[in-house]
């Protein structure tokens, strides 16, 4: 059973495209077609507007919080082809960096695991993915994967930081030898997996095909110490797939259809323990799904967006149309 614990009146003047809680769950960032990014303090069920950030010249599609070990940092991306990195200094939010290296709308931003440093992946309608790495003293290094997806890239999601050969931790005193990976989804109906080579260049490692229309979102599940890697994907075709890879050396991924919805599915998002998947669709509902003991995914609850109503949990084996 799911309950609505808080409703925030953002006072955005147009459609809200994204809302993200910070690491501690005390701040909420929102973005809208009104070209603004807003940050609210939502502690104790309240809502205090902390910042109204203006800098984009078009609809703002997505926001992403960096890990707090780097300070209070928020990234936003927009139809105006720009990525803006905002930073809070002495209680005031200001533009820290602006990336204008794309030729079309930037649709998705995602921070890498904090273990790698401050790295931001950005997916654009120009088909490219750019990776911004903070090098110190206000400087950002930019790498770009051109033609990552023909027609355009809609989503990027990093793999959790796991050391090869070690499921949970690395030997003390040794610097971990992380292999950086992320997934992307595009208008070519594909999910692609990317890996950083030893020379620092990014290489396409795998191509996952199952969707029959644009891939709208991808979400790499958090690691909980198991050797299995899991990715969720959703599409314009109304389908949500769960992709699993049990053997990193073979890099073989198997898709399982979670559900076929009657409308476009915009977003998928994992719980921090990777056992519940939230699915957001074009029919104004958010559904929550959990894997049962027999490996089937079942809907455990659904919430009508904007209305705060919650349905009863469905019994195992039932399928609930979103």
Curated annotation (Swiss-Prot):
> What Gene Ontology terms describe where this protein resides (cellular component)?
COPII vesicle coat; cytosol; endoplasmic reticulum membrane; ER to Golgi transport vesicle membrane; extracellular exosome; GATOR2 complex; intracellular membrane-bounded organelle; lysosomal membrane
Q: Pfam families from the xrefs? A: WD40 (PF00400)
- Membrane topology, record value: Peripheral membrane protein
Source organism, top-level taxon: Eukaryota
- Molecular function (GO) terms listed? identical protein binding; structural molecule activity
* Keywords assigned by UniProt, alphabetized: Acetylation, Cytoplasmic vesicle, Endoplasmic reticulum, ER-Golgi transport, Lysosome, Membrane, mRNA transport, Nuclear pore complex, Nucleus, Phosphoprotein, Protein transport, Repeat, Translocation, Transport, WD repeat
N-acetylvaline occurs at 2
Transmembrane stretches in the record are none
User: What modulates its activity?
Assistant: The GATOR2 complex is negatively regulated by the upstream amino acid sensors CASTOR1 and SESN2, which sequester the GATOR2 complex in absence of amino acids. In the presence of abundant amino acids, GATOR2 is released from CASTOR1 and SESN2 and activated.
Q: Where found in the cell? A: Cytoplasmic vesicle, COPII-coated vesicle membrane; Endoplasmic reticulum membrane; Nucleus, Nuclear pore complex; Lysosome membrane
The main location is membrane
Residues the record lists as Phosphoserine modifications: 184, 309
GO terms classed as biological process:
cellular response to nutrient levels; COPII-coated vesicle budding; COPII-coated vesicle cargo loading; intracellular protein transport; mRNA transport; negative regulation of TORC1 signaling; nucleocytoplasmic transport; positive regulation of TOR signaling
Task: Outline the WD repeats, range by range.
Answer: 11-50, 55-96, 101-144, 148-204, 210-253, 260-299
The record's subunit annotation is: At the nuclear pore: component of the Y-shaped Nup107-160 subcomplex of the nuclear pore complex (NPC). The Nup107-160 subcomplex includes NUP160, NUP133, NUP107, NUP98, NUP85, NUP43, NUP37, SEH1 and SEC13. At the COPII coat complex: interacts with SEC31A and SEC31B. Interacts with SEC16A. Interacts with SEC16B. Component of the GATOR2 subcomplex, composed of MIOS, SEC13, SEH1L, WDR24 and WDR59. The GATOR2 complex interacts with CASTOR1 and CASTOR2; the interaction is negatively regulated by arginine.
Similarity comment: family membership:
Belongs to the WD repeat SEC13 family.
Protein function: Functions as a component of the nuclear pore complex (NPC) and the COPII coat. At the endoplasmic reticulum, SEC13 is involved in the biogenesis of COPII-coated vesicles. Required for the exit of adipsin (CFD/ADN), an adipocyte-secreted protein from the endoplasmic reticulum.
Q: What is this protein called?
A: Protein SEC13 homolog
Q: Which organism is it from?
A: Homo sapiens (Human)
Lineage of the source organism?
Answer: Eukaryota, Metazoa, Chordata, Craniata, Vertebrata
């Amino acid at each position: 059973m799911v309950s609505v614990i808080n409703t925030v009146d953002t006072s955005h003047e147009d459609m809200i495209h994204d809302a993200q809680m910070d690491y501690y769950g005390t701040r909420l960032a929102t973005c809208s077609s009104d070209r603004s990014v807003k940050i609210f303090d939502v502690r104790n069920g309240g809502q205090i507007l902390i910042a109204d950030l203006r800098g984009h010249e078009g609809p703002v599609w997505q926001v992403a919080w960096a890990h707090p070990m780097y300070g209070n940092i928020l990234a936003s991306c927009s139809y105006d082809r720009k990525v803006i990195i905002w930073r809070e200094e002495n209680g005031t939010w200001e533009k820290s960096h602006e990336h204008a290296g794309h030729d079309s709308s930037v649709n998705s931003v995602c921070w890498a695991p904090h273990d790698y440093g401050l790295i931001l992946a950005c997916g654009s309608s120009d088909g490219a993915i750019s990776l911004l790495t903070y090098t110190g003293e206000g400087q950002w290094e930019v790498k770009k994967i051109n033609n990552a997806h023909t027609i355009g890239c809609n989503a990027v999601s990093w793999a959790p930081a796991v050391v090869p050969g070690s499921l949970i931790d690395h030997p003390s005193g040794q610097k971990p030898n992380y292999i950086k990976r992320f997934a992307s989804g595009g208008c070519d109906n594909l999910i692609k997996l990317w890996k950083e080579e030893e020379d620092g260049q990014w290489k396409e490692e795998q191509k996952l095909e199952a969707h029959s229309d644009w891939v709208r979102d991808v979400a790499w599940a958090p690691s909980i110490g198991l050797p299995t890697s899991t990715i969720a994907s959703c599409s314009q075709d109304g389908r949500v797939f769960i992709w699993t890879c049990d053997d990193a050396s073979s890099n073989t991924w198997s898709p399982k259809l979670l559900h076929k919805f009657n409308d476009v599915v915009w977003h998928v998002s994992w719980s921090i323990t990777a056992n519940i998947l939230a699915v957001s669709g074009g029919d104004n509902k958010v559904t929550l799904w959990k894997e049962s003991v027999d490996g089937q995914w079942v809907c455990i609850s659904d919430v009508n967006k904007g209305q705060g109503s919650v349905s009863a949990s469905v019994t195992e084996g039932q399928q609930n149309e979103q």
